């Protein structure tokens, strides 16, 4: 018990100051104490731990190997203690320590980068921006693993506590490589025609919810990939057909790397922001005000 009492945050702060300032006198000046008080604290620590922390053979204060080890590991504790204090103070003011924004794969993560420095200027809230696919985004919100979700409006809500707001409308186009045989089929394309060609899809990331598929027919052969960029690359490689967000393939279409299969297959979907009303903090409220500004004019 004596050893536990001796190794206090105060003692570790004294050791840290001595190392950074190079002497007991300079450390005492930084800490607003007299050198004899620091000497007493260190001597008491040495006695109770039964170790030698300082090499006192020279003119300059030097740590022994044991002292250096205790200092370096102690700094980890000091950093953790400081962070704990900061987080507690922030939480007391109503600012969350962590906030998770989940974007569905159709929503580009870089669109949210302007939030990061703005939020950091207001609080020490740690921000996570995570991508999920289809039902995986909504599952995170339902299970409390997301504070805010930005995703296509799937027209389902699992709780009256979930609120939402439309951000913008996204146009989707049905595309394939320019030499894909589907372009030789007569329009409008029937399901009998479409089912002959491999569809490319991004895997739903839901763990417990029933997984969803969009724009794929039951008996259609398919290639499933992990990301929307993998889906685009598979299209460019001529491996199949798929619906893609127009902004993600606009340049590919303009430069002839992809071609719209059927203009009649073009569709629009609302992208919404959703959140739980039963868990509101300052950081979340701030983000709910700021996120719509990122999409003004879309």
Swiss-Prot record:
Residues 7-64 form the HTH lysR-type domain. GO terms for molecular function: DNA-binding transcription activator activity; transcription cis-regulatory region binding. Pfam families: HTH_1 (PF00126), LysR_substrate (PF03466). The keyword Transport does not apply. Keywords: Activator, DNA-binding, Transcription, Transcription regulation. It comes from the Bacteria. Residues 24-43 bind DNA. GO terms for biological process: positive regulation of DNA-templated transcription initiation; regulation of DNA-templated transcription. Positive regulator, may be partially responsible for expression of neighboring gene dlsT (yhaO). Belongs to the LysR transcriptional regulatory family. This is Probable HTH-type transcriptional regulator YhaJ. It comes from Escherichia coli (strain K12). The gene is yhaJ.
């Amino acid at each position: 018990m004596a050893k536990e009492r001796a190794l206090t945050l105060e003692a570790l702060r004294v050791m840290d100051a001595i190392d950074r300032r190079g002497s007991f006198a300079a450390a005492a000046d930084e800490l607003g104490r007299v050198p004899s008080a620091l000497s007493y604290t260190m001597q008491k620590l040495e006695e109770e731990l039964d170790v030698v922390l300082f090499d006192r053979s020279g003119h300059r204060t030097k740590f022994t190997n044991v002292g250096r080890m205790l200092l370096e590991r102690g700094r980890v504790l000091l950093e953790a203690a400081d962070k704990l204090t900061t987080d507690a103070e922030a939480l007391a003011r109503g600012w969350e320590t962590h906030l998770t924004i989940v974007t569905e794969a159709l929503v580009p993560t870089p669109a949210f980068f302007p939030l990061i420095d703005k939020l950091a200027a207001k609080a020490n809230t740690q921000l996570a921006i995570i991508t999920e696919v289809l039902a995986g985004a909504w599952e995170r919100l339902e299970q409390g693993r997301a504070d805010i979700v930005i995703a296509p409006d799937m027209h389902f809500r699992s709780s009256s506590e979930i609120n939402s707001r439309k951000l913008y409308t996204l146009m989707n186009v049905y595309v394939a490589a320019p030499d894909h045989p589907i372009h030789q089929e007569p329009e409008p394309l029937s399901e009998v025609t479409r089912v002959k060609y491999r569809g490319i899809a991004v895997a739903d990331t839901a763990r417990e919810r029933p997984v969803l598929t969009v724009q794929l027919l039951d008996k259609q052969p398919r290639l499933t990939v992990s990301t929307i960029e993998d889906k685009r690359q598979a299209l460019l490689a001529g491996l199949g057909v798929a619906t893609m967000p127009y902004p993600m393939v606009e340049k590919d279409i303009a430069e002839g790397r992809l071609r719209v299969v059927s203009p009649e297959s073009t569709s629009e979907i609302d992208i919404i922001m959703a959140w739980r009303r039963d868990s509101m903090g300052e950081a979340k409220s701030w983000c709910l005000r700021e996120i719509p500004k990122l999409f003004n004019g879309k």
